[in-house]
Each structure stands twice: as C-alpha cells, then as structure tokens.
Amino acid sequence: MQREKFSSRLGFILISAGCAIGLGNVWRFPYIVGKYGGAAFVLIYLAFLLILGLPIMVMEFSVGRASKVSAALSFDRLEPKGTKWHWYKYGAMAGNYLLMMFYTTIAGWMVQYFIKMMTGEFEGKDTAAVAGVFSDMLAKPGTMTFFMIIVVVGCFAICGMGLQNGVEKITKVMMLLLLALMVILAARSVTLDGASEGLSFYLAPDFHKVVEYGLFDTIFAAMGQAFFTLSLGIGAIAIFGSYIDKSRSLTGEAVLVTLLDTFVALIAGLIIFPSCFAYGVDPGEGPSLIFITLPNVFNSMAGGRIWGALFFLFMIFAAASTVIAVFENILSFAIDLTGCSRKKAVIVNIVVVAVLSMPCVLGFNVWSGFMPFGKGSGVLDLEDFLVSNNLLPLGSLVYLLFCTSRYGWGWKNFMKEADTGEGLKFPKWAKFYVSYILPLIVLFIFVQGYISKFM
C-alpha cells in the first residue's frame, strides 16, 4: 500500500507544532516563567530547548523519515540484525494510548466550558460560585463521558478522512485560527487598565527570583519544561517524519516547529498575566487557572462573555490539534502492524480509546477514593506520571542511543538522513555531546522526576 504524504511543507510544520503545542503551554509555562524570574527564566529555557529538545526532535523525525513507518515498525526496519531495539514499539504505543486516556477528558472540559461561556452561565456568579461550576462538572461522570466521546469521535472522524483531506487540511485551519485567536486575546489583555504590572511580572528579568528559588531549581524547571513541551520520546513526532519527502533537511524543520511551540507558550503568558493582574487575581497554574481563575477574570471584563468564549475556542484548538496528531499515530500503528484499512482502524480505535478514557472520567467522582500519590491525587495524576515521568524521558533515551550508538542505527545513518535536503544541517561537532552528555541529562531528568515526586 502506497504511504500517504503531506501535500505541503506548511501542513507538516503546523501539524508537528500542533502535536507539540499542548495544554502545558498555557497552564504551566506562563506560571513557571513568572515564578522563576520572567525573562531571566525564558533565556535559560530557550537555551535548554536548543540543546535538549531540538536534537531529540531531529532524531525522531529522522527515524520516521528513514523508515517511512510509525514507531510500531520503524525500529524493526532500521535496527541492525539480531538487536532488540524494536521492543520499544510497545513503549511508544503505550505512551500514545496513555496520553489520550486523560487528554480526551480534558479536551471535553474545554468544549463544555466553551458552551458555558457562550450561554452566559458564569454571568453574575461570585468567585466561589465559579469554582462550584468546575466541581459540579467533575461530579457528573455521565456529562463528562458524553463530551469525552464527542472529542474521541470528532477527532477520529477527521483522521478517518485521510492524511491530506482530513488531518492536514483541518489541522492547518485550526492552527492558523489558534494563532490568530491568541494574538487577538493577547492584544486585548495587554491593553487592559493595570495590565502593565502583569507584563513586568512576566517579562522583566528578575535575577533576584533566580537566586531566591536557587539556581539549581530554576535550571531544573527550565530543563523540565524544555524537555516536556515537545512531547518527545513516544514516536508522536516521528510519525510526521514518515509522511514527508527528502527535499528539506530535518534540523531546519525541527527549529521551525520548536519556534512555533515557543511562540504559543510566550503569547499564552501575554493573555494570562496582564488580565489576571489587571483584576488583582493570583494566576496560579494548572486546571484551576483555566477553569476557575480565568472565568472569574472574564466575569469582571467588559464583553467578558465573548472574550471567554474566544479563549475556550483557542483552548479547544490547542487540545484538538494534539489529540488529532496522536490519533493519527495510533491509527498508523494499527495500519502498519495489521495492514488494515484506515476506516477499520478508526472504528476499532474509537471504541478502544473511549473505553480506556473511562478511568480518568470516573477518577473524579465514582473512583475518587483512589489516590495513588496521596490526598488530592487521582487516576489522571497516575496516567500523567506514567507518560511524563517515565515513557517520555525513557523513550527519548531510546531515540538518542539508537541514533548515536554503533549497536543501533548509528551516527552515520542518522546524519545522512537528517542532512538530506536543503536547509540547516545538524552540527557534526555535536556528536560527542548527543552521544554521551545528552543521554546523561535525560537520565537526570528521569531520576529527578522521581525524587521530586516521592521525596
């Protein structure tokens, strides 16, 4: 069967960026930027993106393009005879399914909140009542299941239309609308009365905060965010390498994807901080920022119902772009491994992903007694921990060693693939760094993740 290809370079870059751009860009990045010293932190973060995230992304793209298949078969095709690199296919597949087991539920929340904003449900509510809307939503497994299934069916339906006609065409429109919405929301936020304080908190370099939190903590926060923001290690990015030709070198393409991801994260901060400071609200981070803090801010704002609806529309696009990208990977696993049609893979996986997403839905209500990491934790935290703290760093380590070790695909093969085509070349002098130092950094992130979680 002839492998499908992207119809344009723009489609490839926007879809790869859509996979990388996730909810963490909005609910985590701005918060840690403000906490660790604004622009001072951003500079450290950008340095780590360059030396940590970028090389691994180039390696994922290279493995995908050279093998022309998903992570379900890419190691089988490229590994030296008699080696066992292909065992990691199970880790990659598990990572994609695990990520969707909670992401579909959160994407469903975004759809619910968009409707709530549009219908004016928050108007006239005080802070406690707005928080009550969120806890009421979590207490209703039936409603959450309904919206989760809408996300699963809707995003798989787009994938079912094919790579060019479905995934590429629709994600391109979504990503361009996402970027336009962000610019409009940021322009509104920075022109609010009192927004300047939020801007200086976010962007003014504050080296005192770097000292206050400790240089090590600041560097580790920057390192972790740079590593996790690009969703590397589970083959979610590699799949898009398998859909492109060899006309462009892969380092240049990875730089563009990384820049887009960074642009979205930085602009998210321009939406959140000026508006929170303008209304005297502590931004915080995580789901409470999106579902409690910001609805309160929109409540206080002239035309807040419209701005709130636009914000949640942007969040739907951010979540859906990731879901569609990962669903495309999940479908390609099925197609590559079984040779089944795209349509059959879609039908089977709609059922599989919907069923696998149920523990996350039930973890907030029926199964709320299950607290894997102590009080306040739930099923979602366990699923997130398995992906973020385990499969992403360990998978990245596999890609690194596979592309640099003579027992794997090897440095020469990797460099030949990465540098084929016009554009920026992968630096030859980086061989020692990516072969010996970068694997140690990734291992450090893995170990440190356990230390900060359990100690």
Language model features: what each stretch is:
Residues M1-W27, I56-F61, R65-Y90, D245-S249, ...:
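Membrane-interface "cap" regions at the ends of multi-pass membrane proteins
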Residues Q2-F6, E168, K172-A320, I324, ...:
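Membrane-embedded translocation segments of transport machinery
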Residues K5-S16, F41-I44, T83-Y97, T145-V151, ...:
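Select transmembrane alpha-helical segments in multipass membrane proteins
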Residues A320-A325, V346-F364, D381-K416:
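Hydrophobic alpha-helical segments of multi-pass membrane transport proteins
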